[in-house]
């Protein structure tokens, strides 16, 4: 079904408002408003334009019903600051999971893949689009599916910290509880990842006054030949935070 279909559009709005009224919904993820894995605009033709306009109209209606709703609009959005008149987060583009470069473990290459897309689609192509508004699939720890199978403790902690330090207001945790319980830290303590996760959450909450102004620093995580140091910086006149990542397997 397409949101450009009037009957489906009206049904969709009724479902959203009903979930707010009956179940106190405070978050909606709207996915698949386009067939494009990496979008720079709506799908071609009138239908594509109507689908994009329809999701904007739906979000206006939902926001009017509940002003504090968090709206995450994913596949079908593109790197434009104008989306944030209506939604709270947009998709970084391309696949849910992938790997980029030839450096480090599959987990390190996954982080590089994710952040390379942010650099390509937002930093280079749309530099005025804020990067604290992105859905990136922040932290993934699972034994299932096409995801990183490296379970090195230090690598997992690095991925976790990057997910929070990038400043995104949309932090996702795809973490397997059993793995969180089982994986041991460098002292042999199982379950330490829960403490690490709590520390990341606490750190982000303590930086809530500065992270909304997060900016990219450094280079391209993977430029096709070389893995380059990069990171995120934020400041507000009273304090600042700086996070750097070296995606290379050697010191830089």
PLM regions and their residue ranges:
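Alpha-helical scaffolding segments of alpha/beta enzyme cores, especially the outer helices
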Residues: 14, 18, 50-61
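The substrate-binding groove and active-site-proximal loops of carbohydrate-active enzymes
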Residues: 1-13, 34, 38-52, 145-150
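Active-site-adjacent "subsite" loops/lids of carbohydrate-active enzymes
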Residues: 1-23, 93-95, 100, 105-109, ...
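Active-site-proximal substrate-binding groove within the catalytic cores of carbohydrate-active enzymes
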Residues: 56-252
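Short acidic catalytic loops
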Residues: 12-43, 71
